[in-house]
A protein has these predicted regions:
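Generic recognition of long tandem-repeat/solenoid scaffolds
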Residues: 56-60, 111-113, 272
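Phosphate/anion-contacting hairpin/loop surfaces
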Residues: 66-187, 192-199
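N-terminal functional module of multi-domain proteins
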Residues: 5, 9, 27, 33-36, ...
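General N-terminal leader/first-domain-start detector
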Residues: 1-25, 31
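Short secondary-structure junctions
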Residues: 21-24, 44-49, 78-79, 89, ...
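A short, compositionally biased
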Residues: 51-53, 103-110, 246-248
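Acidic/polar residues in short coil/turn loops that connect beta-strands
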Residues: 62, 115-117, 268
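Basic, nucleic-acid-binding surfaces and adjacent catalytic neighborhoods in DNA/RNA-processing proteins
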Residues: 21-37, 41, 50, 162-289
């Protein structure tokens, strides 16, 4: 899940569960052996849900945070009220299946939140295989995976200073590769990378060392603008209107040139781009479609 979708999810969860007390937590015994650190959050109040890049943070009133990255089809979801009982009933031990890959898997975590005893509970479920840590809130940024993250385009107030500085430490790398480096900028995926390159007129082969200061500043502004726009679309459940990503062979909406694909990236990510609209740093590419 890319940063904009993670932020939109964090904002939704924050609206729904902040200020609510954790009434129950169900953890399938065959998975996590009723992890006591997790269950110690029962009776605590959610202070806020926030995000940084592709990571979610649930901060609780007793100084503990859940830190979660939704990878490998992992997902947080709020259960419709009418389905609460289905998820609040502890699942039976799983039978030995004849075809394990067809087995229905229960949620990894089921959390029941409640504001008042007279109101229906709010049930949230975590499914899939996320990266998940339980940490003291004050030490979250000391965790190696979190400490290594670069600035968040719309969550870090010093982004316009920090991002260019980190970028300039890699003069021989392409802009395309650095935009996917989570230690340089947190939350970008390949789709937004392609759109940012298009917005700034940078070729996928453009090198950091060849950019002027004004071009790097323009790149930083485009990153912020496109991440903010993508977050708005994600929050409304709308598809992002991509102009180059995954549009190989279609005509550019600006100049009518066919969208091409650059396959030369050493990180194995494809870059969709317009050869006419993105001349900055363009080099002969023997691998174009």
């Amino acid at each position: 899940m890319e940063g904009p979708h993670t932020r939109a999810l964090a904002e939704h969860l924050n609206d729904v569960v902040t200020g609510k007390m954790v009434e129950r937590i169900l953890v399938p015994e065959h998975r996590w052996q009723a992890n006591m650190l997790l269950l110690n959050c029962v009776g605590q109040v959610v202070q806020r849900v926030r995000s940084h890049g592709k990571w979610l943070f649930f901060d609780f009133s007793h100084g503990i945070s859940w830190v979660c990255q939704l990878i490998t089809k992992a997902k947080w979801a709020i259960v419709p009220t009418e389905a609460n009982e289905k998820y609040l009933t502890p699942p039976p031990p799983p039978p030995t299946p004849s075809r394990p890959h067809k087995r229905h898997r229960p949620p990894l975590i089921t959390v029941c939140f409640r504001a008042q005893t007279s109101t229906p509970p709010i049930v949230a479920i975590l499914t899939g295989h996320p990266a998940f840590f339980i940490l003291p809130t004050e030490k979250v940024w000391a965790h190696p995976e979190i400490r290594a993250l670069g600035p968040d385009p719309i969550g870090s107030p010093d982004f316009h200073d920090d991002f260019p500085y980190r970028l300039r430490q890699h003069p021989t790398r392409t802009v395309a590769a650095t935009l996917l480096d989570q230690e340089i900028v947190a939350g970008l995926g390949n789709a937004l990378k392609c759109e940012i390159l298009f917005a700034t007129r940078f070729s996928p082969s453009a090198k950091i060392g060849a950019l002027m200061a004004s071009q790097i500043d323009r790149l930083a502004s485009s990153v912020v603008a496109l991440v903010a726009t993508a977050t708005t679309f994600a929050g409304k459940g709308l598809p992002f209107p991509y102009r180059v990503y995954d549009r190989a062979g279609l005509l550019c909406t600006v100049c009518n040139t066919e969208i091409a694909v650059d396959r030369s990236g050493q990180d194995a990510h494809l870059s969709w781009y317009c050869p006419t609209c993105q001349p900055v740093g363009q080099e002969p590419n023997l691998f174009s479609a």
